[in-house]
């Protein structure tokens, strides 16, 4: 199982960015994909989830309006778009596969992270 994320991004404040997470080694539509934010010196912050099988999405309220999650089943790729970027969006963003086991969800495989730098 591998989750390969797109490369680092340097973008202007106020613009948008779309990053990708390409899955391999398993059936893409059988597991959820989550996105997680980590700012320097801070903990992990869950952004949202997408079910690649049916396109169902669930977002952290904090990121509603900021983030759109999509998938392309034909290429086994998940995407996250962030809009109206500010310096607060500068962070490393991870995708992570979720698995349901024993009544709970766990993140069992992670991408390597995409570094986003927003410049003014």
Curated annotation (Swiss-Prot):
SUPFAM superfamilies attached to this UniProt entry: Immunoglobulin (SSF48726)
What Gene Ontology cellular component terms go with this record?
Answer: extracellular region; immunoglobulin complex
Q: Does the keyword NAD apply?
A: no
Which biological processes are named by the entry's GO terms?
Answer: immunoglobulin mediated immune response
Query: What are the transmembrane regions?
Result: none
Q: GO molecular function: any one?
A: antigen binding
Matching entries from CDD domains are given as:
IgV_H (cd04981)
Record's keyword annotation contains Transferase: no
Q: What region holds the Ig-like domain?
A: 1-111
What keywords were assigned to this record? Adaptive immunity, Hybridoma, Immunity, Immunoglobulin
Q: What is this protein called?
A: Ig heavy chain V region 36-65
Species the sequence originates in:
Mus musculus
Q: What is the lineage of its organism?
A: Eukaryota, Metazoa, Chordata, Craniata, Vertebrata
């Amino acid at each position: 199982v591998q989750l390969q994320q797109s490369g680092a991004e340097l973008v202007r404040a106020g613009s948008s960015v779309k990053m990708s997470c390409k899955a391999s080694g398993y059936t893409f539509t059988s597991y959820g994909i989550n996105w997680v934010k980590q700012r320097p010196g801070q903990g992990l912050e869950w952004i949202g989830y997408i079910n690649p099988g049916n396109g169902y999405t669930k977002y952290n309220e904090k990121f509603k309006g900021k983030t759109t999650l999509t998938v392309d089943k034909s290429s086994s790729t998940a995407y996250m778009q962030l809009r109206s970027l500010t310096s607060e969006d500068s962070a490393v963003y991870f995708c992570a596969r979720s698995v349901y086991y024993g009544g709970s969800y766990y993140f069992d495989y992670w991408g390597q992270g995409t570094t986003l730098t927003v410049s003014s």
